[in-house]
Design a protein with these regions (language model features):
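Surface-exposed extracellular loop regions of Gram-negative outer-membrane beta-barrel proteins
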Residues: 1-29, 34-87, 89, 110-171, 265, 269-271
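Membrane-embedded beta-strand positions of outer-membrane beta-barrel proteins
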Residues: 9, 26, 40, 94-96, ...
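Outer-membrane beta-barrel signature, preferentially recognizing the C-terminal barrel domain
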Residues: 48-109, 113-115, 180-195, 200-205, ...
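Repeated loop/turn-to-beta-strand initiation elements of outer-membrane beta-barrel proteins
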Residues: 4-7, 35-38, 102-106, 207-210, ...
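Residue-level signature of outer-membrane beta-barrel architecture
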Residues: 1, 28-31, 44, 98-100, ...
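Sequence/structural signature of outer-membrane beta-barrel proteins
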Residues: 12-18, 47-49, 89, 115-117, ...
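Gram-negative outer-membrane beta-barrel transporters
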Residues: 114, 120-280
């Protein structure tokens, strides 16, 4: 039928470990003409931190930035945080599907998500950056080897930071760091929006059925609040050590070709991922 409107309302109640939430959702589907479908939805959700994030201890190693002319590795512990708040999100989407012919279908969707209280681990690099501004390491989350000095002389000015032969012997180097004690925190907010698209074409070919699909996603914005309070848009960058998220290419896509005949089938997939800049998005 055409010129029809369907509306669905739903809600989910969840109670775990003394925390509860009611998450509503509304969705609508409008068919203004034959082969044309317009849809929209809005809702919210929440997720508790995992057992490891709340109570676990995860050992790892990390490569730290140059200190005293030395780039080195140090041990790191990510300690659980029992006071983590649940992650929450609000989202809405709107899209249209058009069956142009029996063979050709076009699909376009716009989506927008806002996440709050996202759980992420504080990176050792962020701990070090926040603590070294005055040239001395005093953060209790950074443990030095016994007898090591906590002065970074290239910051305090006792060394030019270039010629290793002139570096005072009591100046701190990267090898003096024994351990980072990082932990999980609720990152403030992440906002993201973008577009998904797909073109599908099916046709008979050599006694069988062939099809071509072109689909992809374009991320317009992926911005989050870092541990220092700054707003970072990491789209198109490798910002995993800054915003607590992975690499974020702006465009991803697939071209899929299929062919089916009797008991035989063929599928070919070509994937495209946009390049990313290996840079600090805060720079």
């Amino acid at each position: 039928p055409t010129d029809t409107l369907e509306i669905d309302l739903a809600a989910r109640y969840e109670s775990t470990l003394g925390q509860s939430s009611v998450e509503p959702k509304i969705s609508a589907l409008w068919t203004p003409a034959e082969g044309v479908f317009i849809r929209a939805s809005a809702g919210s959700s929440f997720r508790l931190a995992s057992e490891n994030q709340s109570f676990g201890i995860g050992p790892s190693g990390t490569t730290i930035r140059e200190i005293g002319g030395e780039v080195t590795q140090a041990r790191a512990l990510a300690v659980g945080n029992s006071n983590l708040l649940p992650e929450e999100s609000d989202s809405w989407t709107v899209g249209v599907t058009w069956d142009v012919t029996d063979s050709l279908t076009l699909d376009l969707s716009y989506w927008e998500y806002e996440f709050t209280n996202l759980v992420t681990v504080v990176s050792p690099d962020d701990i070090l950056l926040a603590d070294q501004a005055d040239g001395f390491i005093t953060d209790p989350r950074i443990e030095l080897f016994p007898g090591a000095n906590n002065e970074i002389c290239e910051i305090t000015g006792r060394w030019d930071g270039v010629n290793l032969n002139t570096r005072p012997g009591d100046c701190m180097t990267g090898f003096d760091i024994a351990l980072f004690k990082s932990g999980f925190i609720n990152q403030n907010t992440v906002e993201t929006n973008g577009v998904d698209f797909q073109v599908s074409y099916d046709f008979p070919f050599m006694g069988g059925d062939a099809g071509i699909r072109v689909n992809g996603a374009y991320v317009n914005r992926y911005a989050g609040t870092a541990t220092d309070g700054s707003i970072i848009d990491v789209v198109g960058t490798d910002g995993s050590n800054v915003a607590g998220v992975g690499t974020n290419p702006q465009l991803r896509g697939n071209i899929i070709a299929t062919y089916n005949r009797d008991n035989h089938s063929f599928r070919w997939t070509t994937r495209f991922t946009d390049g990313t800049e290996l840079r600090n998005p805060r720079a």
